[in-house]
């Protein structure tokens, strides 16, 4: 390898490492957003957004352009009921899951897509609390300012919000039924050594492909509860 070829390879490796570091930083940023959103921590949420002319947050309540508008939303909420967010039983969990991130070639901007899923608890004026589940998609644009990745544009698209007892399909279309599990082992599409499946929590532990990252020990998955007895 010539000195020139070696220099080119080093340059290429530096670019690859930088891209991986950018992706890691963006993941950290997005996950922090989810944790702050759980309790509507307005100051922390606002800090994650870039101070930029393109800064934008788009949700069902509307489009909030500029960092100041984003800050007003997080401080006041959609209807100005700040007391609700400070209620000890308020919960707005939106786990940031399955992120797919693409960094621009110049390393200054990026885009990401995430699932948002979690449990909610919204205190009501009558003293009761409205629990539910929510699921949606985030499409996010990021920008690097001063070497720090920040949120530039966040779009939240709700897929469903379901009250705790009603499920996430319309009542008139809902039909509760049990799946036939475990499936028929004689089914030609399922070999006899296929993994176990259960309808309810049963003590079944899905096998791990990896060993313990600290001890290197293979994880024991043979421990199960059956008929009230522990089986090894």
Q: For each predicted feature, which ranges?
A:
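Short, aromatic-enriched amphipathic alpha-helices that serve as compact interaction elements
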Residues: 22-38
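Transmembrane beta-barrel outer-membrane domains
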Residues: 24, 90-92, 131-133
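A solvent-exposed, acidic/Ser-Thr-rich amphipathic alpha-helical stretch
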Residues: 42-118
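Conserved helix-adjacent loop modules within structured domains
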Residues: 132-137, 157
């Amino acid at each position: 390898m010539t000195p020139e070829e070696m220099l080119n390879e080093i340059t290429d490796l530096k670019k690859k490492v930088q891209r991986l570091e950018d992706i890691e930083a963006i993941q950290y940023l997005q996950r922090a957003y989810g944790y702050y959103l759980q309790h509507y921590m307005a100051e922390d949420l606002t800090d994650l957004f870039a101070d930029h002319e393109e800064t934008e947050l788009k949700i069902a309540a509307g489009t909030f352009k500029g960092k100041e508008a984003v800050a007003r939303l997080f401080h006041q909420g959609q209807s100005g009921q700040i007391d609700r967010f400070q209620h000890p039983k308020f919960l707005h969990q939106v786990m940031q899951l399955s992120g797919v991130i693409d960094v621009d070639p110049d390393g200054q901007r990026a885009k990401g897509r995430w699932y948002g899923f979690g449990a909610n608890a919204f205190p009501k004026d009558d003293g009761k609390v409205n629990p539910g589940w929510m699921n949606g998609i985030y499409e996010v644009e990021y920008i690097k300012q001063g070497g720090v990745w920040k949120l530039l544009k966040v779009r939240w698209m709700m897929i469903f919000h379901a009250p705790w007892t009603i499920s996430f399909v319309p009542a008139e279309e809902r039909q509760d039924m049990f799946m036939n599990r475990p499936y028929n082992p004689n089914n030609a599409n399922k070999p006899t050594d296929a993994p176990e499946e259960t309808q309810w929590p049963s003590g079944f532990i899905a096998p791990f492909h990896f060993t313990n990252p600290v001890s290197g020990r293979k994880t024991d998955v043979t421990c199960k509860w059956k008929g009230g007895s522990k089986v090894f």
